[in-house]
């Protein structure tokens, strides 16, 4: 048997009341605690597996709505930074639930690495439990407030010239760049794409490549090279 768990205190931190408190108990049970238990109990690994998928969905939806013009590759880059072990560990710390983890005496979480893994898994298992008990809505309400604000997510995407250009034009002109594409087929049947990027209906850059995405990046980089250099004082977006 595990020691008494203050269900009410944990629910207050999660801002969620379980109809099946047993799910919360399971979510708090680290595999090492199960291994040292004299009686058969269920550990958190299955809930962790579920919570990982739920977290991915919630973060994907959040980014999709927050950045309506970002391409999927850039969104994936940002998502990876918001669902990794370091991020999940931070969410557990923000919720203040780490001390409730039931962990075996032989498990070392004194080191930063040990705490990172244990806390990250705890958040995912808790999220899985909330989802099973209440569905996607309370799982979303638990997760979204923990995510960093828009201005802190943007740097996660800044390696892509399209994103840098978008940040620049939004800050300077409150408009989004527009990409116009023309497909060109040569005599051998090879297709390439000619892209123009327009800002306020003015052509800022052009790109040509066999991939539409790559041509857009080339056009965006040309726009940054030309117009960004003219506005170096305002490029820190």
From Swiss-Prot:
Cited InterPro entries: dsRBD_dom (IPR014720), RNase_III (IPR011907), RNase_III_dom (IPR000999), RNase_III_sf (IPR036389)
The protein's required cofactors: Mg(2+)
UniProt keyword RNA-binding present: yes
Compartments where located: Cytoplasm
Listed HAMAP family: RNase_III
Family label: Belongs to the ribonuclease III family.
Subunit field text: Homodimer.
The protein's name: Ribonuclease 3
Organism: Chlamydia pneumoniae
